[in-house]
Amino acid sequence: MRLLGKIAIVTGAASGFGAGIARKFIAEGAQVMLADLNGAGVQTLAAELGDTAASYQLDVADRTQVTALAADVEAQFGALDIVVNNAGVTHLPTPMETVSEADFDRVFAVNCKSIYLASQIFIPAMKQRKSGVFLNVSSTAGISPRPNLNWYNASKGWVNTATETMAIELAQSGIRVNALNPVAGETPLLKSFMGEDTPEIRAKFLSTIPLGRFSTPEDMANAALYLCSDEASMITGVCLRVDGGRCI
C-alpha cells in the first residue's frame, strides 16, 4: 500500500476528481478527510468508504471553517501528511467583459484563496515536523487557455505559479508541493466549461485532445497517488499535465 499510515485532506471530494482521489488514497492505505461544500455528498461517500474516511462540510474560502477542519482532522486522525486542494469552480463561457463581479470573486475565492488559506493553516505544523505534501489541482486552462473562460483560465494560471513558488520556498522545510493540470473531464464541471452539453460541442472539445477522450477521476487519482506518495520524494514544483496531449 503506497499511502499506508498517511493522513490526508481532499477538498471538493463529493464528486468528480476529488471523489476519485479520495477513493484511491483510501484503497492505498491512507486515512482521508473528505471535505466539500456539499456536506451530504461527502457524508454519503465517507460512509461508503468505511472507517478510514470521514467527512466535513466546508467552504474552502472561509478561514474559520478551514481552521476548524484542521482541528477536526487532528482530533480524528492525528498529524496531517497530505493536503489535496481540489475544490474548484468556473464561470460559464462568456466574453470576459460580461462576467459578473460576483462570479469573478467566486472563481478566485474557491480556486485561489482556498490554497492561500490552506497554506496558512496547515503549513506551520508541517514545518515543525519537516514533512508534508501539498497537491493543487489546476487545469490545462492555466497553460493553454480557451476563449470565453478568461477569468477561470487566469485563476488556474495563478495556481500553477503559486505551486512553483510554494515548492521553492518550502523545500528546505521538507514539504513538497505539486499540481495536476487535467484536461476537461467527465465531472459536474464539464457542462459549465462547454456552456451546453451537446454531441457537437463534445466532439469539438475532443478534437483538441490527441488521445481522443476526456480525463477521468481514475486518471487524476493515479497521478495524485504518485505525486503524494514517497515514490515521488524527489518531485516538487511540478505541474503535471493529465491532458491526453492537449497542451503539446
PLM feature spans:
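Alpha-helical segment proximal to the catalytic Tyr-Lys
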Residues: 124, 168-172, 233
